[in-house]
Amino acid sequence: MKGKRSEAITQGFERAPHRALLMGTGIPRKELGKPLIGIATSFTDLIPGHIGMRDLERFIEKGVHTGGGYSFLFGIPGVCDGIAMGHKGMHYSLSTRELIADMVESIAEAHRLDGLVLLTNCDKITPGMLMAAARLDIPCIVVTAGPMLTGTGRGGRRYSFVTDTFEAMARYKAGEINAAELQQCEDRACPGAGSCQGLFTANTMAILTETLGMSLVGCGTALAVSSLKRQIAFASGERIVSLVREGITPRQILTREAFENAIRVDLALGGSSNTVLHLLSIAHEAEVDLPLDLFDKLSRETPQLASMNPGGKHFMEDLDAAGGVPGVLYQLRDQIHDNPTLNGVGVKQIIDSVIDVDETVIHPKEDAVRPEGGIAILTGNLTPDGAVVKQSGVSEKMMTFEGTARCFNSEEEAMQALMGGQVKAGDVVVIRYEGPKGGPGMREMLAPTATLMGLGLGDSVALITDGRFSGGTRGPCVGHVSPEAAVGGPIALVEDGDTIVLDIPSRRLEVKVSDQELAKRRERWQAPEPKIKKGWLSRYASVVTSANTGAVCKAR
């Protein structure tokens, strides 16, 4: 091991003040020569995905000390997208990804930590942590806190967050369930600690973190309440000290091949469309070229092998029992690169260690759920720079659709129309000025999409937006439309009554309006006033880039 970063604060007579401050925290002098490990914890008792982290912190600390290091905890904020959904709070969710990356960078650099254990779980926290790891390029290992168990009900019914709350709300509005049944859904949907039970954004990112090689084998699917999760936390603490001594850093792991592996696993499972944004942003920090169209190229080659909630019947506990990430890699083995991982072995060795895969959950290729992957990238005159659709959540009937535009300039306007019965079969709901700059913050449209499904319109109405969707979204919903409305993208020029064509097999999203007419509308179009003119979101809107490049922040 070459000279440690922490020697800048622990060695030499001129560092006497630094040592005094460190010993003021309780660290004995004899420990100052050990690798100093930061545990970036996003613990909060405000959200269920993170309430179990106090226990995991202890096991990580034990592992660090067993491995011969000395650990320090520092806090990182965490936002629950479910709680932030459908109101002003959702403006802040995506933007916290950048704050998290900046905060981890700031603490690690200011205190010259030798390595980091990144304790995370929910939607934007995991990509923010990975962005920081790639940017810093110091030894790092990620521990995701794990998924929640499904709720239980009579007759073996299994409850989960999205389908039994957001969609239940719309069913209640439609008179399909009564108030007592709605309350029962509320009571049973979230039985304890962990990220939401389906293949939503948090769990997809945990799986991709393991696939990338940035967490230990099994971490991506090990349940929050399991003893295995604690064992992984301990092993991760022990492993980070070895990574420091071996000089293994994230950019040695986060190669182009690692990202291709992650995309293929994402596609095979039908994961959240948000992963497109996040993988692009992590690759940006790792200085890896990852074009948007690569997702579509790989999707055409990679079959969907699992039917995961929200679009299917299986939950994270099923995937974990079926073989987890190694099981998926095994079924894709002829398409997977042998990339290094933080486990000390390559991906192929992990695949070779697989003993058994439950093929009723993780199908073999010859019995694929769909011939293509879960995500498709669309282009056309409505989205010249690309848009994203989670095709794994779209019914065969809606893979091609032609409908009449109903335009709304905010999520709130769209929800008012949906709940007021103003959206009918054959419509295409257009929600715009919700992009990274225009939102600002590119809000998730889970409430509108869940309402469409709950109202029984999932097979007769499409929704397109320059915003994004929850990992819990299902149905014919196209997001990340780029360029966004706030910068004059074509979605800003669509008018009520226009005909919109959605053709997922052909990867097209178009409005049936001539170029000449669009040019006339562009001449009349005026950029709206910013919705938020002060504070963090105002600054964020001024530096955030388009969704097709990951909505990363760049200097003015």
Curated annotation (Swiss-Prot):
A Gene Ontology term for the protein's cellular component: cytosol
Keywords: 2Fe-2S, Amino-acid biosynthesis, Branched-chain amino acid biosynthesis, Iron, Iron-sulfur, Lyase, Magnesium, Metal-binding
InterPro entries: Dihydro-acid_dehy_C, DihydroxyA_deHydtase, DiOHA_6PGluconate_deHydtase_CS, ILV_EDD_C, ILV_EDD_N, IlvD/EDD_N
Cofactor(s) demanded: [2Fe-2S] cluster; Mg(2+)
Active site (record annotation): 470
Entry-annotated residues carrying N6-carboxylysine: 124
Top EC class of this enzyme: lyase
Taxonomic superkingdom: Bacteria
EC number: 4.2.1.9
Role played: Functions in the biosynthesis of branched-chain amino acids. Catalyzes the dehydration of (2R,3R)-2,3-dihydroxy-3-methylpentanoate (2,3-dihydroxy-3-methylvalerate) into 2-oxo-3-methylpentanoate (2-oxo-3-methylvalerate) and of (2R)-2,3-dihydroxy-3-methylbutanoate (2,3-dihydroxyisovalerate) into 2-oxo-3-methylbutanoate (2-oxoisovalerate), the penultimate precursor to L-isoleucine and L-valine, respectively.
Protein name per its UniProtKB record: Dihydroxy-acid dehydratase
